[in-house]
Amino acid sequence: MSLKIIIIGGVAAGAKAAAKSKRLLPDAEVHIYTQDTCVSYSSCGLPYYIAGDFEDWHKLIVRTIEEFEKSGVHIHKLNRVTKILPADKKILVKNLETNECFFVEYDRLIIATGSFPYKPEIKNKNLKNIFTLRTLQDGINIRETMEKSNHITIVGGGYIAVELIEAFVKNGKNVTVIERSAFILSVFDEEISSLIQTFILENSNDRVKILNEDTVSEFVGEDKVTGVVTQKGFGFETDMVIISAGVRPVVDIAVDAGIELGVTGAIKVNSRMQTSIPDIYACGDCVEKINMISHTPVWFPLGSTANKEGRVAAINACGGVEDFEGILNSAVLRYHALNISMTGLTEKAAQKLGFDTVSVVITKRDRAGYMPEVQNVTLKLVADRRTHRVLGAQAIGCGDADKRVNTVSVGLLSNMRVEDLLDVDLTYAPPFSTSIDILISAARILKSKLS
């Protein structure tokens, strides 16, 4: 009898798990149940659709429902899984169009429920024109409302918030950001996040205002939002609001089924994406990860990680053996010409974990100074004082900041020491780098500090 694999959720991890399962076991019965109207789309691309970088939102769909069905993967859209019954190996499903509820049996279950936007308790937060960005429909709604708006408020200052600031400014909108930290992108160390905030303010045609160390006390309006009042007493008019105050893992049905959560509040899995209950796997934004430097549990949801985990979950659910060892918190984004990237531990994160850190911040040209496209890059390199192990890197600049960070990312996997980084044989030609790359220069300074 063929194996029946049920997957809950189908955006990134779930879609990857379904496709991989069908390729591994062509005779298996593979089903995706999703409360969404679409599957397998790039939610990471939504800010760029909103910006108008491309006009057709269909380009965000990686694989259509019709393509899945043709391959033998059955898609059940607008079907919400409301309960998992592990003892009976069944799920309870509610059809959101007909309200019909029914049971479905499984041999293997893969949970890929993702994450949901966190909405703080703010007075009148349910007024019209207050949005969060998670689904394809959210992106479509935000773009349509943006086109009719002049002033937009963003609550929060993380990755998505920065991408949306860029999108709105590009479309000639005025933006006010309310951020509870001293600088936006507070996941970075302050030397870097302060430079990012300065760049945004100086390169936005005076359209951006950032209210740091403040929060929203209430939204103003009767039917739709017309204004914002902050905890510090600032009040201003606005046409729409984006709440971008972080996300949380969707774990309610897992908890109800008795599946163990980790210390981060996400589903706890082993390296084979197995949960605490046999034949139930989990992957993507709903699961806890392991930081490969500190070997501690973390929750850092990214689309690239979700795809890797979906693949590993499928292999193991189909009877194979594959491990996903963890993450390095590698990330990249941009604000207009500014590239922003990081990998590994920031200095503040490393210190919280007990590392005795040494760091350097250096600014240097990204290629030969006589090349017309030369730009500056600012790099922060962090190491452990005792072992000299490189712990992480952060880089920003209008030049190629991200390729320096990617180089460090590879080194982190091999426990690279500062001295090892000095020996890396990087490529050189005037259009691509300086003869002594900024990465090598930073390592030299770090070595001097360590000795």
Protein language model annotation of sequence segments:
Residues 2, 8-12, 20-27, 35-36, ...:
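Flexible, glycine-rich terminal cap/loop adjacent to redox cofactors
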Residues 2-74, 166-191:
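Beta1-alpha1 glycine-rich phosphate/pyrophosphate-binding loop at the start
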Residues 27-29, 71-97, 104, 170-271:
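A Rossmann-like FAD-binding core segment of flavoenzymes
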Residues 60-61, 151-153, 159-218, 300-306, ...:
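Rossmann-like dinucleotide-binding cores of NAD(P)H-dependent redox enzymes
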Residues 111-171, 209, 263, 269-271:
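Glycine-rich dinucleotide-binding loop and its adjacent helix/turn
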Residues 126-149, 220-229, 235-315, 407, ...:
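FAD-site-proximal beta/loop scaffold in flavoenzymes
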Residues 269, 283-346, 431-450:
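A conserved FAD-binding loop/helix module that cradles the flavin
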